[in-house]
Amino acid sequence: MNLFFTKNHIVFEFDETTGVSRLIEGEYFRIEQMLSTDYETKVRVNKKELLNCIDRATLLIRESDKKPIIIQIEDGEMRLKLTSGVGSMNEEIVIEKEGKDILIGFNPKFMIDALRVIDDEMVTLYLVNPKAPCFIRDEKESYIYLILPVNFSSASV
């Protein structure tokens, strides 16, 4: 395989195939700084229950819609809400919570992508605030998934 770089592109050549991709402009996220061990809220939740709930929510949104799933964590409960032109959903899941209550929004597809590849029965989410990334990781740190939150209007809640 051959690799070629220009100022704005990268070119991959292998066998009789050539691929071209545009390079990202600007600075990329500094992942090391984002992977903090500090958190305000730690949540343990049944992975299958959370995944099924988010999966059901995606039935209410079209691919072109950028509707976030709103997650409200209070006491021993996680409320998941989504409202779209098709309908709305509001579900509750029992959780183990350590730390502060939080209200945060995520692109449901990104959350589903992370949860689908985790083999554990229970997952642990670490949250700092509604504008900081969420981490899903196990105790041994054999995996870490970073999911960026999305902004949402208070009218969506």
Predicted regions and their residues:
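DNA polymerase processivity clamps
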Residues: 1-24, 39-157
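Specificity-determining recognition surfaces
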Residues: 30-31
